[in-house]
Amino acid sequence: MEHFIDTYLYELRKVRDEKTIKKKEYLLKHLQDYSEDLPAFDQSEIFSFYEYLKNKNLKETTIRDILKEVRLFYEWLQEQGLNLKFDEKALKKLFQSKKSQEALKSKKKYYSDDEINLILNAIRGAVEGISTKHPIYYILTIFLLCSGLRISEAVKVRKKDFEVKRILTEEGEEKEVWFVKVREGKFGKERKALIYFFRPEWKRIFEERLKKLKPEDFFFTYAVKYPKSVKVFTLTDKTAKWFYWKLEKELREKGYEIEVNAHRFRNTYITKLATKGFPVNLIADWVGHSKISTTMDVYMEAEREKQLEAILERI
């Protein structure tokens, strides 16, 4: 393969500038890493190559450039008399499928588990090229996912607003059920919301944090160390929204097409509880929807999105 690529680039140097040649060389290097021989790119091989590139954490735009350059390289090979297949219809089908999936993601109302992991990892500094954020934003994100509160409601929660009830299950086992009191909800209404820890480690994070707070303390009080002092702040909805806006911007710059906003955390809470079998009327009470139809709409749209995603994955 190396001989053919070198010859291809040599011929192109006669008509293209060196910057373009270097880019093409970089793009074709991924083909060399993928296979020692020149593969026949039928639909199965094209999709396999795409998944290989995806697993290298390359940007979607870079993957497209690689596939397009490989197609041009194979056209040149065919002109040289080599009988090597490259299924252009399959490539077009792949691009259309991925375009549909990206469009779906851009308007999707809830987060998948992979998207939740991406956001949390970015906050922890576990995504390459993104610095570690203050731990308060990790806790805030978990809280929004587990409580369904609006961000304006969440930042006003105090330690005394948490309530842990112990109930007996049908099997006779004791189980904890967590609630949070929303004192200043939308339209000034008070309510209680179920806190459902979708992962056991999240509950432990909350337990440890509550131990450090006094009853009147805001839950989202945090300290920032400066060279000569430590200052204590209470998170505001404006600061939190600004944080998520900046985080989304950072992720997009690294090639991750994802929206990061509190409302989608809220909708994720609704969707997860509904799929676990919680009655929609109870969920509506917990999230403070005045109409049960609003809650039902979120759930039904999420179900339609999941069905569409499953279809697109099979294309």
From Swiss-Prot:
One of its GO terms (molecular function) is DNA binding. Keywords: DNA integration, DNA recombination, DNA-binding, Plasmid, Viral genome integration, Virus entry into host cell. The keyword Aminoacyl-tRNA synthetase does not apply. GO terms for biological process: chromosome segregation; DNA recombination; establishment of integrated proviral latency; symbiont entry into host cell; viral genome integration into host DNA. InterPro entries: CB, DNA_brk_join_enz, Integrase-like_cat_sf, Integrase_catalytic, Integrase_recombinase_N, Tyrosine_recombinase_XerCD. Residues 1-78 form the Core-binding (CB) domain. The keyword DNA-binding applies. Residues 106-313 form the Tyr recombinase domain. The active site is at R150, K186, H263, R266, H289, Y299. Pfam families: Phage_integrase (PF00589). Belongs to the 'phage' integrase family. May function as an integrase. This is Probable integrase/recombinase aq_aa09. The lineage of its organism: Bacteria, Pseudomonadati, Aquificota, Aquificia, Aquificales.
